[in-house]
């Protein structure tokens, strides 16, 4: 399985269960269906709706991912840092430049239609899945004036070091104008 499939398995199992419990405990009267109706533009709403309508991740599939696949990802990621004697990875935070919410949907990446949700989370998934610290920092504004970001990932347990690296980056990054936000 690729990292997107594993990420979706873990996320969707945990989100459907955890978010439902959280919303019920909050007592604010907002249910998962209400929330889904409000986040459809991101692509996440449609995916959550599918899960609620019977495509939920089974306990067996989740257990396999968390006990077998996740440790393999953790080991692979640890090897990258150790074998290359590096403290952090630096990468574009997303596969796509940011879009206005009204323009979200799907894009073609490497000849394959991909939801904006997957494209925007693809690069940050290895650390998230493996339990490594990850940091996303504004890098610049795109030609359309929207903020673009870079990501930093560190080895498990390097949270403070990674924050120090991010803070050092922000000190040397050119000052960025604030994006113009439409009301």
Briefly describe each language-model feature range:
Residues 1-2, 97-100, 143-144, 160:
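Flexible loop/turn segments at secondary-structure boundaries
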Residues 1-9:
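Acidic helix-start/capping segments at beta-turn-to-alpha-helix junctions
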Residues 76-79, 114-138:
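Small-aliphatic-rich amphipathic alpha-helix that forms the alpha element of a beta-alpha
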Residues 128-183:
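Structural helix-boundary/capping segments
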Residues 12-75, 92, 96, 136-146:
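Short helix-loop capping/hinge segments that flank enzyme active sites or metal/cofactor-binding pockets
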Residues 87:
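Conserved acidic residues
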Residues 7, 99-120:
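Short, surface-exposed loop/helix-turn segments at secondary-structure junctions
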Residues 84:
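Active-site charged/polar residues at nucleotide-handling catalytic sites that mediate phosphoryl
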């Amino acid at each position: 399985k690729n990292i997107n499939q594993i990420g979706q398995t873990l996320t969707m199992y945990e989100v459907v269960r955890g978010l439902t419990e959280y919303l019920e405990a909050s007592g604010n009267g907002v249910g998962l269906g209400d929330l889904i109706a409000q986040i459809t533009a991101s692509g996440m709403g449609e995916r959550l709706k599918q899960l609620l309508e019977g495509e939920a991740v089974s306990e067996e599939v989740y257990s396999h991912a968390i006990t077998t696949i996740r440790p393999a990802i953790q080991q692979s990621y640890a090897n990258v840092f150790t074998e290359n004697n590096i403290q952090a990875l630096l990468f574009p935070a997303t596969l796509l430049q940011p879009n206005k919410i009204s323009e979200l949907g799907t894009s073609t990446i490497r000849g394959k239609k991909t939801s904006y949700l997957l494209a925007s989370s693809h690069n940050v998934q290895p650390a998230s899945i493996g339990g490594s610290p990850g940091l996303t920092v504004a890098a610049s504004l795109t030609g359309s004036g929207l903020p673009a970001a870079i990501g930093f990932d560190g080895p498990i347990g390097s949270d403070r070091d990674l924050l120090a690296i991010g803070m050092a980056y922000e000190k040397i990054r050119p000052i960025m104008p604030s994006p113009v936000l439409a009301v």
